Amino acid sequence: MCSFLNVGKKVTVWRVSWPVILLLTITACVSTSAAALCPQSSVDPSVTICTPKDGAIVPSPTHVVAGTNDSHTVKLLQIYLDGVKVYEIAASSLDTTVSMSAGKHRLTVQAKDSISQIFKQTIYVTATAGGLSNLKHIIFFVQENRSQDNYFGRMGKYRRDRGFNDSFDELPLNGSFPDKAGHLVSPYHFKTVCHENLTPSWNASHYDVHGGKMDRFMLSALASTIDPDGTRAMGYYDWTDLPYYYELAFQFGTSDRFFSSVLAPTIPNRMYLFAATSFGHIRPDKPPEGGWPQPTIFDKLDNAGVSWKYYYQDNSIYLAEWSTWQRDSGKVVKIANWYTDINNEDTLPKVIFIERATATGLDEHPLNNIQTGSANTKKILDALMNSISWDSSAFVLTFDEGGGLYDHVPPATVPKPDSIAPMLRSDDLAGDFNETGFRIPLIVVSPWSKPNFVSHRVRELTSILRLIEVRFNVPNLTDRDGMADDMTEFFDFSTPHWVTPPPLPDQPTTGTCDFNLEKAPGH
């Protein structure tokens, strides 16, 4: 499978938003090997659908590969399902996935070339029941302010040491950049499990990117008497600090192309997490009386009759800033209920959000102890793995944004959620909502997870919403989640690989937490 918008050429993607007759999800990606894998007809012009075959019985989602033969330049490829256009790409071949309801469907791939010739191929497929229906519960838990390189920059070595010599875009240890004093600093292993804050603000984040050079994280770091040169931006952790997370990600599914939604701090990203847009906001702006009125994923679930619950751990309840809270506060309950609810699968809601524990310092945010935070995550997930609900659940663990910590991969291009421009002030750096934020850690945990899996497809936080929408037939919120990958690549529904969860290590909480140890060696 190819990576979305990650194959060295730009593509234009269009997809259907709600309403549509069928539940359809397209992963917009172009494979550089699609044509080679798909022998073309000698007819000029023609479209050849190589996968699936005509008359095939297919799972949902199903893999679709098609190519063209044309003496003129093919400008556009489109997919129609039962006469409804669901996908469009400016390319001469495609390699993507389509989710559909159970039953027989007419699938057409249509091309248009430079002289406006239109030609196509149509096949019939039958989608089987099952697939995503094996997931009766989707749980998402989003911690705070960690970049991919800060937590999982050494995951490639961890995998190689266990016999997996696959590609994993890991932290380049030999890179170096100037700090505020002009000294070159390379990534270094933190000697402390806590450190001072940096800044993931709109301006700092856009400054850090520097046209894709990714070399200004230290320069934008918040002032500190301990680390005045900002070197802590280059610090990282590994399996000796976070053995539970490393093994969890190794055994189940992870990604080296999962991003936050916007180059901005926590609140705009959590707006995307709930509403698939920040409706122009780039700062932690105060909501109006009664909360933000824009619809959230929870409102969409209500309208679709899909049960949900929101578990909070201390007095941190971000949903209280939304009008959804006024209508649905009864669905927001203390985390103690989680440990009993999961042992009654019949009444466990279909969608669950677990709030991070900010007030008690267990959210893994800079300033806080990463080991006590990750140990708390283990407690929550252990309970699920040992419950009756494990067999039918998927648990998605990620972080809201990178926190100003170094990551070497530039943000990716994504669709704008809507027509609302960023609310820029006169001194703000230019930017828009057509790119992601920085990479963040992701682990997808389920008995249906592909074992030892690494995804290289570009996704961001709204892909979690898309997974929920696709699974429970819920309309999308904006164009951003409507065009997001649905994360089904992480699962193998032919068999549950982890009926019994794999053995996982304890997460120690005895590491040294001392801000005085946060600086780079030699500083």
Residue spans of the language-model regions?
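N-terminal pro-sequences and low-complexity stem/linker regions of secreted or lumenal proteins
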Residues: 129-523
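Boundary at the C-terminal end of the N-terminal hydrophobic targeting segment
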Residues: 34-36
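Bacterial signal peptide processing site
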Residues: 30-32
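Long, low-complexity serine/threonine/glycine- and acidic-rich segments characteristic of extracellular
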Residues: 38-129
